[in-house]
């Protein structure tokens, strides 16, 4: 008998096939493997900086936001701006179940229990709170997702074992830490550097040699190696500018940017990558949705957030015209064909209110839309070059080639 969780998985498979394969006549083995991997939990934490997003979007109490959810961290952080409505969407049923669990926890738990659940994310008390408080509040597909798992390991137990070590990205980070130790490098030592100068010096002295090694160059020259970063074959080529032999150098530059773009006591992305945890002693070095000062506001605004398992194009297609103020695409367009990007922007334009803004990241530097949109569409959207480049320089996640802010000029 098929469970509701199985239905969510089947929907993930169908949505991901459409996203990865698009209109390709021939599906490669790389595409098939990536689509299979991406049906699982990929991002226990989202890897776009919400602080940058909020500065770009300038949300207010009348804003309707449409965003790709991923792990839900940023959709929750946007609530701090008290917009009228946030419509979150994701292809992956695991991400949808994670967002629904977070929503329920914000509604039902006090701050201490909420932070233990999603900040520390490594306590048996989390399982108790799930069973006694949250379980009865969740819908059936979400219950079934967290109660099931491989070989009898219930997924909810990830929050006892250390949630941020799971997911494709969490496992990859763990593998990188293991590999670094083989070179005699403890990546956690970045966390004790006192300023950005020391962080850069430490990286150059201890970490650069790993990226420069022949074995790393060999491994990173294969697209399969980056699937655990959630990077599909098309985005892999954009990341290395079509030259796989240069991928190790590209990854070194991005890793150094992550390690040095901000002081380590102000960059929770670097803490997760190099320390595999959050900085529990420093509230200011946490995602906004995990900070105590924002918790009551989150509780008050949580009903403004909805989450749906769907394609963002279909969500926009079903929205009324002139109804959306902000669209956050993450790096989704790196996956898309030219026709798919054009279709997406037709719907974005149809639903856009006056002054609407769209933000997204790209693996490479160039924007994918400038050469794709028809003159009619292109004339309605203007890239804010100065602000885009400025905000990219501040983005603490440090892994993307560019940040793009487009503003509606109707």
Where do the model's predicted regions map?
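Class I S-adenosyl-L-methionine-dependent methyltransferase module
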Residues: 2-22, 94-296
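A short glycine-rich, Lys/Arg-flanked "PGG" loop and its adjoining helix->strand segment in the class I
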Residues: 341-354
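Conserved acidic E/D residue at the C-terminus of a beta-strand in Rossmann-like folds
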Residues: 88-93
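Conserved beta-strand signature within the Rossmann-like core of class I S-adenosyl-L-methionine
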Residues: 328, 354-367
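Conserved class I S-adenosyl-L-methionine
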Residues: 61-70, 86-87
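Conserved alpha-helix/loop element of class I SAM-dependent methyltransferases that forms part
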Residues: 41-64, 341
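Core SAM-dependent methyltransferase catalytic element
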Residues: 386-410
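A short acidic, Gly/Pro-enriched loop at the edge of an enzyme's catalytic core
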Residues: 60-63, 310-326
